[in-house]
Amino acid sequence: MNEFFRDDIFNRPQNVVDFRFDERTAAVFPDMIHRSIPAYASLLHMLGVIAGTYVQEGDHIYDLGCSLGGATLSLSRFIPKTAHITAVDSSPAMVQRFRAYVEGAALHHIEVLEADIIHLPLKSSRVIVMNFVLQFIPPPARDALIAKIYQALTEGGILLLAEKTQPEDDLLRTWHEAFKASQGYSALAIAQKREALENVMKIETETAERVRLQAAGFRRVLPYFQGMMFKAWVAIK
């Protein structure tokens, strides 16, 4: 994939603006996400493992909000070679980088689209993945998006959903900041990134996430990952 760098976006004092998934973010995103989400590599591995127990020959899969394709590439390791993945993101910088990688690696079973998932028509799919994306969707649009995903899934299909949630205890927030500090982020960088995300990332409680999934019609919602406030569920149609 294109060259990546260590995340130092918020290292220096600055007039903080709203967080954007632009080229500056895309250039450091792999480093940023692994240093920000505890056990992120384990989450990617497990979603691939779980999807592999569902996906059959010729099935279709979506990775909605794919960024640089971490989930897509994990899926590819565990699904049949005849399955097809459509990876979607609204960030031109993310799409350009991931599409260049897919084409360079001749991964013909992966299609990379630049689109707004709120408005994108979804075709029938066995598995849909959405990792840390719903939290960036305007809250009034979330119910309709989950309902659309439910309708697109085949009977018995699954949504693999991961989100940062409101902490049940303030200790979790303290521990998460300690984790980021252990990854080399300064107190200034942590504070400035928090400020940048304040208006664009609206997190909810785990209960709210579950209620939305159940209201859409999912018959079972099972947890499969937790790293402090970062949680993931399998929602089964």
Curated annotation (Swiss-Prot):
One of its GO terms (molecular function) is S-adenosyl-L-methionine binding. One of its GO terms (biological process) is tRNA wobble uridine modification. It comes from the Bacteria. S-adenosyl-L-methionine binds at Y40, G65, C66, S67, D116, I117, N131, R194. Its EC number is 2.1.3.-. Keywords: S-adenosyl-L-methionine, Transferase. The keyword Transferase applies. It is an enzyme of class 2 (transferase). It catalyses: prephenate + S-adenosyl-L-methionine = carboxy-S-adenosyl-L-methionine + 3-phenylpyruvate + H2O. InterPro entries: CmoA (IPR005271), Methyltransf_25 (IPR041698), SAM-dependent_MTases_sf (IPR029063). PANTHER family: CARBOXY-S-ADENOSYL-L-METHIONINE SYNTHASE, TRANS-ACONITATE 2-METHYLTRANSFERASE-RELATED. Homodimer. Catalyzes the conversion of S-adenosyl-L-methionine (SAM) to carboxy-S-adenosyl-L-methionine (Cx-SAM). Belongs to the class I-like SAM-binding methyltransferase superfamily. Cx-SAM synthase family. This is Carboxy-S-adenosyl-L-methionine synthase. It comes from Dichelobacter nodosus (strain VCS1703A). The lineage of its organism: Bacteria, Pseudomonadati, Pseudomonadota, Gammaproteobacteria, Cardiobacteriales.
